[in-house]
Regions:
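Cytosolic, long alpha-helical scaffolding segments
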Residues: 1-135
Length: 135
C-alpha cells in the first residue's frame, strides 16, 4: 500500500513538472510568433548554440521518460549531465547576446526576448531533472 501511495505522489509531481514544461513551450512559441525580426541572424544563433540547447532539452525529456518506464536509475542519472550542459549554454548565451546588442542595437528587443527563450529552455532542463528525481 505504501508503494502505491508513493507512486501516486510521484505521478502528481511529474504531472506538475510536465505542466510547467508546457507553459515554457507556450512561451517559446509566443516568442516565435511575435518575433519582429523576419529571420534571426544565423551567425548569432550558431554562437548561442540554440539548436544544441533545444536538442538537449528534447533528449533529456526522452531519456527521463525512458528512465521512468524502465525504472532505470542509470538512465535517470545521465539526465543530470545534460542539464549541466544546458546551464553552460545558457550562461554563455547571455554574454553573446550582450555583445551582439552592443553591435546591433536595432535588434535589442528581439535579443532581450531571446534571453527569455534561453531561460525557459534552461528551466525546462531543471524541471526534467526534477522529474528524474522521482524515478
Amino acid at each position: 500500500m505504501a508503494i502505491d501511495l508513493r507512486f501516486v505522489l510521484a505521478m502528481l509531481k511529474i504531472n506538475s513538472n510536465l505542466e510547467r514544461l508546457g507553459d515554457f513551450a507556450e512561451g517559446i512559441a509566443r516568442f516565435a510568433i511575435n518575433c519582429k525580426e523576419p529571420v534571426l541572424d544565423g551567425e548569432l544563433l550558431q554562437k548561442l548554440r540554440l539548436e544544441e540547447m533545444i536538442s538537449q532539452v528534447l533528449s533529456m525529456l526522452e531519456l527521463a521518460k525512458k528512465a521512468l518506464q524502465e525504472e532505470s536509475q542509470e538512465m535517470a542519472t545521465a539526465v543530470f549531465a545534460k542539464d549541466n550542459l544546458l546551464d553552460e549554454i545558457n550562461a554563455n548565451g547571455t554574454a553573446v547576446l550582450a555583445d551582439y546588442i552592443g553591435k546591433h542595437s536595432e535588434s535589442a528587443l528581439s535579443c532581450l526576448n531571446l534571453v527569455s527563450v534561453f531561460r525557459k529552455l534552461e528551466r525546462s532542463g531543471d524541471h526534467i531533472t526534477d522529474r528524474k528525481n522521482v524515478v
